[in-house]
């Protein structure tokens, strides 16, 4: 199957308070035991995709550090163009996504499907055949950790998201932290709202399902490894 062309936005303006003091840098630039930087390891999840534009929304105080590894981000992702956006911390991942998406609007390939990718998880994101009228897709792995987001699925093939919730176990399908918006017009419409009753990407997707009647697919990712908490980092590679 031919690789799908995609754009990628990595929102990285969180404070990373759970990891503070482990290493003298921000969370995305921390090193894993194998030497990979967090966000570079996460980008390796996209090896089955043809990345066109990569947008990294980063903390202003660490702009120089990110700039020093910008070429590596391009090499790892295979992106045709990489854009670094320094910014002050925001109140939520959705606000950070909006900053990245506004930059994407200046790109010639803005209408391509767009991944929103967390910086603290790795997994092999599979290729898939989109369903009719599919607006997006969520990738998941088997887990029961209450600190994750979870989906409940439906459909003949159990591959349609019926519900997505944050930090509440409603199934054994934990969200990997990779969200694909295939309908860019829908994403733009969602981000044009000025306020939300939620701040997580999962809430944005649930809103799309409930209010826009959007069809969101679900696919299992392989070899998922999380490293966003101290406990997960200690278990990395074991």
Residue ranges and their predicted role:
Residues 1-10, 18, 36-114:
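Conserved N-terminal catalytic core of the sugar/cofactor nucleotidyltransferase
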Residues 4-6, 172-238:
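Conserved alpha/beta core of the MobA/IspD/sugar-nucleotide pyrophosphorylase nucleotidyltransferase superfamily
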Residues 8-14, 29-32:
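A conserved hydrophobic helix/loop-capping motif in glycosyltransferases and polysaccharide synthases
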Residues 14, 120, 229:
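Active-site glycine-centered loops adjacent to acidic/histidine catalytic or metal-binding residues
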Residues 15-22:
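Short acidic/His/Gly/Ser-rich catalytic and metal-binding motifs that mark active-site loops
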Residues 24-42:
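Short catalytic helix/loop segments, enriched in acidic residues and glycine
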Residues 116-118:
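Active-site acidic Asp-centered loop
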Residues 122-198:
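Conserved core of the sugar-phosphate nucleotidyltransferase
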């Amino acid at each position: 199957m031919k690789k799908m062309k995609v754009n990628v936005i990595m929102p990285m303006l969180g404070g990373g308070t759970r990891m503070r003091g482990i290493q003298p840098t921000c969370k995305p630039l921390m090193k894993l035991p194998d030497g990979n930087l967090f966000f570079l390891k996460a980008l390796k999840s996209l090896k089955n995709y043809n990345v066109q534009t990569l947008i990294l929304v980063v903390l202003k105080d660490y702009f120089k550090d990110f700039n020093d590894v910008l070429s590596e981000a391009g090499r790892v992702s295979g992106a045709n163009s990489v854009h670094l956006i320094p910014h002050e911390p925001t109140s939520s991942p959705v606000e950070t996504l909006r900053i990245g998406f506004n930059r994407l609007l200046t790109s010639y390939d803005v209408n391509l499907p767009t991944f929103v990718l967390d910086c603290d998880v790795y997994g092999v994101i599979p290729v898939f055949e989109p369903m009719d009228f599919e607006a997006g897709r969520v990738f998941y792995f088997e887990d029961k950790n209450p600190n994750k987001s979870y989906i409940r699925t439906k459909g003949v093939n159990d591959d349609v998201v019926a519900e997505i919730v944050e930090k509440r176990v409603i199934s054994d399908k934990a969200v990997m932290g990779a969200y694909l918006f295939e309908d860019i017009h829908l994403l733009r419409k969602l981000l044009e709202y000025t306020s939300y009753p939620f701040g997580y990407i999962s809430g944005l997707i649930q809103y799309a399902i409930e209010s826009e009647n959007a069809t969101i697919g679900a696919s299992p990712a392989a070899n998922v490894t999380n490293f966003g908490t101290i406990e997960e980092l200690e278990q990395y590679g074991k």
